[in-house]
């Protein structure tokens, strides 16, 4: 059991049988009475947000989550298939659950899959992925309509802004946390 003083951003709790992650946290101590802990939380299954205020005497149950190393195998329609690296069991995760992570998945990529009650609820990708540029419009020197970036599309269909020197066929490194360009990869 956790007490209210253990609450912090990023902590995963079991609230009414569902896993929640604390995304914002505020502590206040009024002149009289107990300290109050105000938590903004996100349901890790539905994505719904919840704001609750707790007293210092409240107790909490840590969410029973399990993380497993898995390998992405392939996608088929709306399903993305993964294999457990330890026992070789296979499972699929829907496109809706993966969200924008689908743009960074590559065949045979190792990922961490988070489970709650033996059901996958989230994946953690490597921080950086290298993807090939499949479409890059030419950049016109002297185009002063804004910043010195241009839109491109990579092999997975993801679109982003990159410096003008990036050309079609180049491999680039992308930060999976932000979806932004990091550097061009030497081939």
Swiss-Prot record:
Q: Which GO terms describe its molecular function?
A: translation elongation factor activity
Q: Which residues form a coiled coil?
A: none
**Keywords, comma-separated and alphabetical:** Cytoplasm, Elongation factor, Protein biosynthesis
- Keyword NADP (UniProt): no
Q: Name one GO biological process term.
A: peptide biosynthetic process
UniProt entry tagged with the keyword Cytoplasm: yes
Its localization reads: Cytoplasm
User: Per the annotation, which location comes first and is thus the protein's main one?
Assistant: cytoplasm
Tell me the pathway: Protein biosynthesis; polypeptide chain elongation
Where is it found, in Gene Ontology cellular component terms? Answer: cytoplasm
User: Which family does this protein fall into?
Assistant: Belongs to the elongation factor P family.
Q: Which NCBIfam families match?
A: efp (TIGR00038), PRK00529.1 (NF001810)
- What does the protein in this record do? Involved in peptide bond synthesis. Stimulates efficient translation and peptide-bond synthesis on native or reconstituted 70S ribosomes in vitro. Probably functions indirectly by altering the affinity of the ribosome for aminoacyl-tRNA, thus increasing their reactivity as acceptors for peptidyl transferase.
Q: What is this protein called?
A: Elongation factor P
Organism per entry = Desulfotalea psychrophila (strain LSv54 / DSM 12343)
């Amino acid at each position: 059991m956790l007490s209210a003083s253990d609450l912090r951003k990023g902590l995963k709790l079991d609230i009414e049988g569902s896993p929640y992650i604390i995304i914002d946290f505020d502590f206040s101590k009024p002149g009289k009475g107990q300290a109050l802990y105000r938590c903004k939380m996100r349901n890790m299954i539905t994505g719904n947000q919840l704001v609750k205020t707790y007293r210092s005497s409240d107790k909490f149950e840590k969410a029973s989550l399990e993380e497993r190393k898995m390998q992405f195998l392939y996608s088929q329609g709306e399903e993305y298939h993964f294999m457990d690296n330890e026992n070789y069991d296979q499972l699929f995760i829907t496109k809706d659950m993966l969200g924008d992570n689908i743009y960074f998945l590559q065949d045979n990529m190792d990922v961490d899959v988070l489970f709650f009650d033996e059901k996958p609820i989230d994946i953690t990708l490597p921080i950086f992925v290298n993807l090939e540029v499949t479409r890059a419009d030419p950049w016109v020197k002297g185009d002063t309509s804004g910043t010195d970036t241009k839109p491109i599309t990579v092999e997975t269909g993801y679109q982003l802004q990159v410096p003008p020197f990036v050309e079609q066929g180049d491999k680039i490194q992308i930060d999976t946390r932000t979806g932004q360009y990091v550097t061009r990869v030497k081939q």
